[in-house]
């Protein structure tokens, strides 16, 4: 926020790349950027944004949904901000919360953490991975898996460039790369 304070006073266009930004910080940024522009981007991966969008579209057609996110072993938060954002977007297209039929857990947490809409999120932290997420949808006799993989940090650069080029066309504070995409 301190860097953005200087930027807003100088009418500098700002790009903030962070996951898990609080509503309080967003509110502060909104107050700061009244005469200039700022975009807060929790995830610069275009494929992750498209995964969330496609998941929203698929949601009404399936009765069960689970999210599995995989990240490198140095990521300290779980679940990822992208997994939580995906669950939030999915839950907005649900007519009712999901029901988990599991009644006997041999190991606590085996069904994942429950996010909005009672959507299970499973987090994997492992060497050899960077950032991956899949959303699995199921209904009678069929499943659909939507998966996104970032195997190299260079995969975030097209999103960074999109934010740099797009922020002059925004007003105030916008959140998410999707505000610059036609989704």
Q: Residues of each region from the PLM?
A:
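Single conserved hydrophobic/aromatic residue that forms the stacking wall/gate
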Residues: 1-7, 11-12
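Glycine/charged-rich beta-loop-alpha catalytic/anionic-binding loops adjacent to active sites
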Residues: 31-40, 139-146
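C-terminal substrate-binding/catalytic lobe of Rossmann-fold NAD(P)-dependent oxidoreductases
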Residues: 63-68, 72-183
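Short acidic/glycine-rich loop or secondary-structure boundary segments that cap or lie
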Residues: 24-25, 48-50, 75-79
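Proline-centered loop/turn at the N-terminus of a beta-strand
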Residues: 13, 36-39, 66
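Rossmann-fold NAD(P)-binding glycine/threonine-rich loop
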Residues: 17-38, 53-57
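Short, ordered loop/turn segments at secondary-structure junctions
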Residues: 19-21, 43-45, 70-73
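Rossmann-like NAD(P)H-binding beta-loop-alpha module
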Residues: 50-62, 78
């Amino acid at each position: 926020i301190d860097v953005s304070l200087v930027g807003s006073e100088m009418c500098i266009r700002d790009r903030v790349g962070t996951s898990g930004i609080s509503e309080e910080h967003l509110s502060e940024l909104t107050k700061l950027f009244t005469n200039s522009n700022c975009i807060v981007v929790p995830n610069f991966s275009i494929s992750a944004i498209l995964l969330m969008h496609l998941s929203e579209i698929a949601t009404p057609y399936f009765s069960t949904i689970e999210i599995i996110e995989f990240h490198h072993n140095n990521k300290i938060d779980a679940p990822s901000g992208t997994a939580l954002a995906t669950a939030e977007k999915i839950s907005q297209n649900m007519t009712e919360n999901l029901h988990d039929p599991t009644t006997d857990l041999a190991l606590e947490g085996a069904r994942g953490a429950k996010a909005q809409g009672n959507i299970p999120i499973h987090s994997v932290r492992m060497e050899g991975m960077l950032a991956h997420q899949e959303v699995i949808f199921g209904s009678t006799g069929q499943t659909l898996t939507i998966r996104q993989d970032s195997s190299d940090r260079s995969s975030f650069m097209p999103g960074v460039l999109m934010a740099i080029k797009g922020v002059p066309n925004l007003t105030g504070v916008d959140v998410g790369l999707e505000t610059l995409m036609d989704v």
